[in-house]
Amino acid sequence: MSGVRGLSRLLSARRLALAKAWPTVLQTGARGFHFTVDGNKRASAKVSDSISAQYPVVDHEFDAVVVGAGGAGLRAAFGLSEAGFNTACVTKLFPTRSHTVAAQGGINAALGNMEEDNWRWHFYDTVKGSDWLGDQDAIHYMTEQAPAAVVELENYGMPFSRTEDGKIYQRAFGGQSLKFGKGGQAHRCCCVADRTGHSLLHTLYGRSLRYDTSYFVEYFALDLLMENGECRGVIALCIEDGSIHRIRAKNTVVATGGYGRTYFSCTSAHTSTGDGTAMITRAGLPCQDLEFVQFHPTGIYGAGCLITEGCRGEGGILINSQGERFMERYAPVAKDLASRDVVSRSMTLEIREGRGCGPEKDHVYLQLHHLPPEQLATRLPGISETAMIFAGVDVTKEPIPVLPTVHYNMGGIPTNYKGQVLRHVNGQDQIVPGLYACGEAACASVHGANRLGANSLLDLVVFGRACALSIEESCRPGDKVPPIKPNAGEESVMNLDKLRFADGSIRTSELRLSMQKSMQNHAAVFRVGSVLQEGCGKISKLYGDLKHLKTFDRGMVWNTDLVETLELQNLMLCALQTIYGAEARKESRGAHAREDYKVRIDEYDYSKPIQGQQKKPFEEHWRKHTLSYVDVSTGKVTLEYRPVIDKTLNEADCATVPPAIRSY
């Protein structure tokens, strides 16, 4: 770490001069601005003023660049470095501050440590959980790879909770079954107490230090560098010293996480601002299925902090003001461990019908105090602490007040199961050369219309690794990096300059709050056409208000006002596509529940035998992916659709799961 400390001293010594005469600081020739976490090397970099004399740009060249250093980004980055690729990792946060750290419940894999299990049963549950909007080839790949992925993490040193005989402990989780839904509740969720994400992220970070990856830490990625339909790297802002960097690479992996902060109440970190999703949009590429936003059933009432599904997996129950275990009415078999969309809607209905708890009757209770205190202390130690801090509740004596809270984005950047980003042209999927995506930023689509709990950490490691393997298959370390135009990234720098000196009438924080409240009010657990239409108008107006922003910090050193404004631009693009996609989808499927279109509209009516039915044309049913585009200059949203992939990778080994009516 001596290299990190040395660079910190260097930057601190120059900070005052940089603030006073920033444009001249970079004009002294070649120098390295970034660092490797282990301090072993500096990549060569050259300064040029080809874009602007006011904003000189530092140019770098790598075999591959990964944007984001959460679970997916780290796994992709060190997978590439391990294969010999000269790899950069650009992240606006230090890696262990990424939002992966907040995941609590666990990671699904059919290890069979608690009872007989099979990855094909996991495959079935995931397809069913997706409400048949998931692509079955990608789900096949993820669930088959899951056991090996968990064993790999164990070999990296991840300290999984253990059974008495030393095996990885696996808890029950929502939507998980045995024998294709006919064998009862599965115990498939591998965990580290209730801090699995924290453990996973630190394990991957520790592993990454073995490899010679160049980390650009606290660098904000502004845009992709696109040339002739190919991705050739990214342009980024160094938050610490205000320098601009073009990182040219033959392969670019986007792993920037979700965009939960489009909503007022969410479990996401304040840094979950959809940066990669917005970069894809500005590049003229589509995003997929952004209308599918998961509400986690158990966010702490009034605070929004996550209470893991593992609480219910360990035996916790949801109760209403009458003391009823109400999930028995809505999901007679799975009860409190039905899929998240089912539980969130059931809770909302209980509150609507007057059975909510508290003085306002606007939440329900999660009861844990019937469980043995030693079980709570061993399996749910973090939850006990969180409940006391944010709700003032001793979980051994009283229930936790909870309410559905925005938690996860099923949609994102469309990819295939290899992590390659797709565009849809003339009815056919086409790969975008040089561009990959993984993690919550991507939409493979393994989650479809609703993600099963504990499939997200699995998604990170499986598809982060898949991106590295795909690049290894198609490229060699040291391959020539395609050139970029001398002024590549010029628009990004112009936008940054415009925001830096924005002198309108609306603060960034005010506009962000208006957007978040509009999304919360108009695109929540239950949706209706008239409210969605009103929401579309409001978000479009707010998008137009971006040109009236006012920023206050004109400097370039740690200008968080500027960074938050750049993040707001990204959030707005995500919000537009989310609410317009939701308004257009005239059905209820998974997390998208329309009160004016209460049924799922498939190519057949699967509540009846399909023999004798005429298949609906593609234009008349909704079992299809939404592709959304935004004209960045006007905010106009354009929607297209692409078919769901029903075929698995090997039908003889893993049969397709045909659509059916979903019940738990």
Swiss-Prot record:
Pathway: Carbohydrate metabolism; tricarboxylic acid cycle; fumarate from succinate (eukaryal route): step 1/1. Oxaloacetate binds at residues 296, 340, 407, 451, 454. The modification N6-succinyllysine is found at residues 179, 250, 335, 485, 498, 538, 547, 615. It catalyses: a ubiquinone + succinate = a ubiquinol + fumarate; (R)-malate + a quinone = enol-oxaloacetate + a quinol; (S)-malate + a quinone = enol-oxaloacetate + a quinol. Transmembrane segments: none annotated. GO terms for biological process: mitochondrial electron transport, succinate to ubiquinone; respiratory electron transport chain; succinate metabolic process; tricarboxylic acid cycle. Its cofactor is FAD. It is a peripheral membrane protein. Enol-oxaloacetate inhibits the succinate dehydrogenase activity. Component of complex II composed of four subunits: the flavoprotein (FP) SDHA, iron-sulfur protein (IP) SDHB, and a cytochrome b560 composed of SDHC and SDHD. Interacts with SDHAF2/SDH5; interaction is required for FAD attachment. Interacts with TRAP1. Interacts with LACC1. Flavoprotein (FP) subunit of succinate dehydrogenase (SDH) that is involved in complex II of the mitochondrial electron transport chain and is responsible for transferring electrons from succinate to ubiquinone (coenzyme Q). SDH also oxidizes malate to the non-canonical enol form of oxaloacetate, enol-oxaloacetate. Enol-oxaloacetate, which is a potent inhibitor of the succinate dehydrogenase activity, is further isomerized into keto-oxaloacetate. Can act as a tumor suppressor. This is Succinate dehydrogenase [ubiquinone] flavoprotein subunit, mitochondrial. It comes from Pongo abelii.
